[in-house]
Amino acid sequence: MYNKGAAFVNNQNSYGVNALLMTGVGALESAWGTSSIAKQKNNLFGLNAVDTSPGQSANTFSSVDVCIKDFAETYMSKQYLRAGWAYYHGGFLGDKASGINVSYASDPYWGEKIAALAWKMDSEGGKKDQNKYSIGIKDTVSTAHTTLNVRKEAST
């Protein structure tokens, strides 16, 4: 994963997937790029490394940059973060009940571990991501389910 920051940021800008969270997934899945799958297959994210045969079934990429692009474009943007897609269970890391974790990983604490890694990286990097984003909350009381109330801050 060394010297791959630009690849993460470029793919964030191209496909809308947060670079810090992608880095967290890569760090967890590949032990910071040191796992045998990362080294032998250029696969930072454990893509298709199923529990029963991770080394055999994991995808092989021509380079780490190609792997990062495929993860951002195909796996995240077009599948796990695409509403209506079979793997979509919410646009957040989550756990085994909701979010990316439902279909991505067997570890029920996968999302929590990535969030902790991302928080630590952001904290050590000057907290550039902390409080940067607004969260949209869909008003599910509306019968048409078409309104989206965006709040600047929490209220009671």
Stretch-by-stretch model annotation:
Residues 1-22, 31-149, 156:
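Catalytic cores of secreted/periplasmic lytic hydrolases that degrade extracellular macromolecules
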Residues 25:
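The canonical Cys-X-X-Cys-His
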